Structures are given as C-alpha cells and as structure tokens.
Amino acid sequence: MTIYVSTGGYSNLSADKSSEKLIKAGISSIELSGGIYSKDTIDNLCKLEKKAKFQIHNYFPPPKIPFVLNLASQNCDISNLSLRHVDHVLDCCLKLGATHYSFHAGFLCDLEVAELGKKIKKKELYDREKSIDLFLERVFLISKKAENKGIKIMIENNVLSAKSKNEFQENPLLMCDAEECIKIIRQVP
C-alpha cells in the first residue's frame, strides 16, 4: 500500500519547496495540493521526479489569480475557469508522471477563496438538480480527456460544517451525504 502525504499543509510555500521538505523527511509519495503560486513550480517538480511519485489534487497548481474551482457552477466564467484549470492539471499530470487526479464535488454557489475551509457566507443557491447535471456533464468531459491521457480521476466528497449548515439552513455542497454520493457515483463513467 502507498500512502501519499499532501503539500497542502504548507500553505505558505510553493509545492516544489514543500515537496523538497517532504523528500528530506523521507517521504517519497506526495499529493500536490494548494500552496502558493510560482510560475516555475511544475518545472521544479519535474526535477524531483526521480526522488518522488506525485499525484495531483483539486486546485493544483494554484493559478496566479486565485479562484475557487467549482465544476457544478452555473456561472459561465467560473465553470470555464474551472474546466481550463482541469485541462492544465491533466497536462501537469503527464509532465510529472502522475497517474491520478482528484477533485472535489461541486458547490451550489460560487465561493470566495477566503471561505474555503471556513464558514461560507449565505448567498443564493443554484438549483441542486441542475448543478448535479452540470457536474456530471463536466465529469464525463474530464473523464474522456483524462482517459485519453492515461490518467484516472477521483471525485472527493465535500464536508459540510455545522456553521455553514446553520448559515444556509440547507446543504450548499454536493456529495456530503451517502445518498447523494451513491446517486452521483452510479452515473459517472
């Protein structure tokens, strides 16, 4: 069994710098997640490829102008940014020899970067069924592109905090409970 350690715990470093720290500590299976933007991150990580195996998670590599990846967004700008980011990630997987790319299920509203992992401010929610349909449509598209590149995709469920549930009085995230996870999983390739 292989256990991957995430670079996400080093939010103040670029992924190549946090990977160097992990490699020095004896960790050679690294999940690239988060960190700060650096235009040379992928090139620098390629230099570490002989010392570590990489997988990529969600919002990596972080873009120069931050946004929240949302594959269920009904906002054309956000959905286009999200899909372009995923296309870039799949290319990064190829460069780094990563065989898997994981991303989170979508959201029923578009979040601000500062809200990630914290209480989400109440806002109008998108229709859940329409967002699920859009998410599935985009997952099919991503899945075909990934398969053509020999990359497997993984969808990670979301976690609804008590604060966000109280704020919205309903669930603004996809795939937080077993029923919805099963419903979506049964429809993906």
Segments from the language model and where they lie:
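Surface-exposed, active-site-proximal loop segments in enzymatic domains
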Residues: P63-L81, C109-D127, F168-Q169
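Hydrophobic alpha-helical segments and helix pairs
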Residues: V89-L141, A146-E147
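Acidic/histidine-rich catalytic cores of soluble enzymes
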Residues: K53, S143-P189
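N-terminal pre-domain/capping segments
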Residues: M1-A98, R186
